Amino acid sequence: MKQLLLSALTSCALVLLLMLRPVTTLAQVPNRAPVPAEAYKVSAEVDTMQGWHRGGAGTLNFSQVSLSNWAAGGQSSLSLLAIGNAYTHYKEGVHSFDAAADLVYGLLKPGKSRLRKNDDRLELNSRYGRQFTNVLSYAAQLNLKTQLTPTTDIEKPDSLLSRFFAPAFILASVGIEYKPTERFSLFLSPATGKFTIVGDQTLADAGAFGVRAARRGPDGLPIAGTGERLREEMGAYLNARLRQPIMENVTYQSRLELFSNYFHNPQNVDVNWENLLDFKINKFFSANVAATLVYDDDILVPIRHTDQPDTRGKRIQFKETLGLGLTYKF
């Protein structure tokens, strides 16, 4: 296994050297036009002298339900969802660099129950590319996903489920990007490192998010502090992105990520599929429908049972949100 890992890392190094070494023929490749503002979620501020494109947006979605003597039943509720994103893009000759940050945080107050979190996501992305044809580039990407605040079980408030960097998922990959238009891109990497970090020792001891659980002593009980806090994987990775206007002021965006571990059940592919349907009402108001599907063969999720104790198992995870609110672009 170590020899396979060494071979994969060597392949990564060779691809990087190929990306960075000077190649005179590449100078003949026509420069791809600067990425227009429409290719991003938000409008961009362009510095034509330096080749930089920068932009971002903040959205605040709000919903409220109030019931009083409502015969059909139901529950009053109040929810707030904050969404922020920012990006920068640089292009000069055959070289390009992209960086982006996305933050989502939501709060829910159902009836007289305590305030709880219903969404929490922090994602950072960076990419370097070196173009060698009109539609193909060597590329290196780095992705980080985690959350900001602790998450506890609704029925057991003292039971911690996750927190900042517990987990954190890091993908480091090198490969080839195919980009025929500014609306679509496909990145394929045969050498990608996936790192799962569980920064909380209690969660690590429980084997949460696929890390190795704590060892057990002679009495059969877990030995505290022996759970591993890092899981390392090497495999193939695919990232496909699409941004397609459907009609005036209506845009569909999709991102599909697939990862296959070379050394452990490679047929069980990890899936992360994000979809967004965005409706622009006017300059400041917008509505959107978002749906995310996730499957990770190494992550066990809680399974509730009515007639027997709760268990944990592999499941397809799905999240859908509908929002209407204020949007500020910069």
Regions found by a protein language model. Give the residues of each.
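Repeated loop/turn-to-beta-strand initiation elements of outer-membrane beta-barrel proteins
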Residues: H95-F97, V135-Y138, R183-L186, N249-Y252, ...
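Cleavable N-terminal export/targeting peptides
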Residues: M1-D47
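Outer-membrane beta-barrel "beta-signal"
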Residues: I316-F330
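Residues on the lipid-exposed face of transmembrane beta-strands in outer-membrane beta-barrel proteins
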Residues: G56, L60-F62, A82-Y90, L124-R130, ...
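Transmembrane beta-strands of outer-membrane beta-barrel pores
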Residues: L60-S66, E92-V94, L103-K109, L144-P150, ...
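Extracellular loop and loop/strand-boundary signature of outer-membrane beta-barrel proteins
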Residues: S68-G74, K109-R114, P157-S162, D219-E228, ...
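Transmembrane beta-strand segments of Gram-negative outer membrane beta-barrel proteins
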Residues: T48-Q64, H95-F97
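Outer-membrane beta-barrel translocator domains and adjoining extracellular loop/strand segments
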Residues: S68-A72, G111-L115, T151-P157, V198-D205, ...
